[in-house]
C-alpha cells in the first residue's frame, strides 16, 4: 500500500494554529500515515491526537522535528519528496508520476519556507499558480493521487462514527471494548 | 458556463480570519465567481480584493450578507444550494449530480452553523464523514465538479503571473495598461 507522510514547515505557534490543524485533519482524512511538525507546538499534537482517539485510525503527529533530518531519513528509506507551493510544476503535469510513487513525503510551508526546500524536494509542485492555501493544496493533491476512493476510507477503533444523512446530524457512539 | 458562488457562514472575526481567507482563495482559484460573507469583516474583504487586484480575474467578495436572503435570491434565480459539512451524503455519491448543476451555491460553515441551513440546502454533502476542514471540503468538491482542468484557469488583468518552474520562484510583473 502507498505510504504518504506530511511534513509541515514554517508553522508559527498561535498564528498558524488553525491552518496547521486543518492541514493535519486533511492529511489524515485522505490517508496520510502521519504529520511531522518542524516546529514546537504541543497544542497541535494534542488537538490532532484527540481527533484520532475519538474518530479512529492510526494517524500520528511528531512534534518539533528537524526537517533536513526527516527528509534525509525518508530518502534513505527509498521515499520521494514532493513540495507543494504556488511556484512549481503544475499538478496536472505531475499527478501521474506522483501517483506511481509508493512512498511519498508531501511538504507544505506556511508563508515563508527555508529556500533549500526547493533543492531538497524531488518535485516542486504548484497546485495552480495562484495565491495558495496549503490546506487546499494538500487536499487536491492527495485526492488526485489517491488509490481508490479516499473519501470512503474507514478509521478503525473510532469512539464516534457518522452515518451519512440527507438532513441533520447522525452520529453513533461506538461501544467500548 | 457553470456559475459557482461560495457562501461562508459562522465566520468569527479574528478567530476565523485565516481559515476564511483560505476558503476564499480556494474558491477563487477553482473558479467561483465570488464569496458571500455572512458576517461583518472588512479585513477579509480587503485581503481578498488585494489578491484579485494583483493576481487578476473578477472574483468578488460581499461583506455582511443575510444568508437567508442570499439563499432565497439564488433559488429564485434558478440556482441550487449545496451545504458542505461532515454529516451529509458522501460526495462520491453526489458529485455527478452536482456536476450537472449550472448554477450552484456552495455553503460552508465554521464550527457552528444555524441549524436551518440543513433544511434550506438542496443537498447536504459530506466530504468524507470525518473531522472536517472547510478549506479542504471546498477544494475537493470544486475540483471534482469542475468543467475542464480548474488548475489551468487563467486570471485576466493580473499584475503578477507565476511561470511554473522545477526549482525556485519565477514571477513576472506584467506591464500596466
Swiss-Prot record, chains A, B:
Q: What class of enzyme is it?
A: transferase
- A single Gene Ontology CC term: cytoplasm
Pfam families to which the protein is assigned, alphabetical: Trm56
**Which UniProt keywords are listed?**
Cytoplasm, Methyltransferase, S-adenosyl-L-methionine, Transferase, tRNA processing
Q: Where in the cell is it found?
A: Cytoplasm
Q: What is its EC number?
A: 2.1.1.206
Q: Which reaction does it catalyse?
A: cytidine(56) in tRNA + S-adenosyl-L-methionine = 2'-O-methylcytidine(56) in tRNA + S-adenosyl-L-homocysteine + H(+)
Listed under GO biological process in this entry are: tRNA nucleoside ribose methylation
Query: MF terms per GO, please?
Result: tRNA (cytidine(56)-2'-O)-methyltransferase activity
Question: Which residues hold S-adenosyl-L-methionine?
Answer: 84, 109-113
Disulfide bonding pattern of the chain: none
SUPFAM superfamilies referenced in this protein's UniProt entry, alphabetically: alpha/beta knot
Main location (coarse class) = cytoplasm
Domain of life, per UniProt, equals Archaea
| Family matches, as PANTHER family | TRNA (CYTIDINE(56)-2'-O)-METHYLTRANSFERASE
Q: Sorted alphabetically, which NCBIfam families does this protein's record hold?
A: PRK03958.1
Q: What does this protein do?
A: Specifically catalyzes the AdoMet-dependent 2'-O-ribose methylation of cytidine at position 56 in tRNAs.
The family this protein is said to belong to: Belongs to the aTrm56 family.
Q: Subunit structure, per the record?
A: Homodimer.
Family annotation (HAMAP family):
tRNA_methyltr_aTrm56
* Protein name in UniProt: tRNA (cytidine(56)-2'-O)-methyltransferase
Gene source species: Methanosarcina mazei (strain ATCC BAA-159 / DSM 3647 / Goe1 / Go1 / JCM 11833 / OCM 88)
Amino acid at each position: 500500500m502507498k505510504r504518504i507522510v506530511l511534513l509541515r514547515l514554517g508553522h508559527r505557534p498561535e498564528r498558524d494554529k488553525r491552518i496547521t490543524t486543518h492541514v493535519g485533519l486533511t492529511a489524515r482524512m485522505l490517508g496520510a500515515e502521519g504529520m511531522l511538525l518542524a516546529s514546537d507546538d504541543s497544542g497541535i499534537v494534542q488537538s490532532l491526537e484527540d481527533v484520532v482517539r475519538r474518530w479512529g485510525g492510526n494517524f500520528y503527529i511528531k512534534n518539533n522535528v528537524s526537517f533536513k533530518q526527516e527528509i534525509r531519513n525518508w530518502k534513505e528509506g527509498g521515499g520521494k519528496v514532493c513540495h507543494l507551493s504556488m511556484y512549481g510544476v503544475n499538478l496536472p503535469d505531475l499527478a501521474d508520476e506522483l501517483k506511481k510513487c509508493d512512498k511519498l513525503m508531501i511538504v507544505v510551508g506556511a508563508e515563508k519556507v527555508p529556500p533549500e526546500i526547493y533543492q531538497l524536494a524531488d518535485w516542486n509542485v504548484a497546485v495552480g499558480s495562484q495565491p495558495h492555501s496549503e490546506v487546499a493544496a494538500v487536499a487536491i493533491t492527495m485526492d488526485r493521487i489517491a488509490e481508490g476512493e479516499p473519501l470512503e476510507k474507514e478509521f478503525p477503533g473510532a469512539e464516534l462514527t457518522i452515518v451519512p444523512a440527507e438532513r441533520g446530524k447522525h452520529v453513533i457512539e461506538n461501544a467500548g471494548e
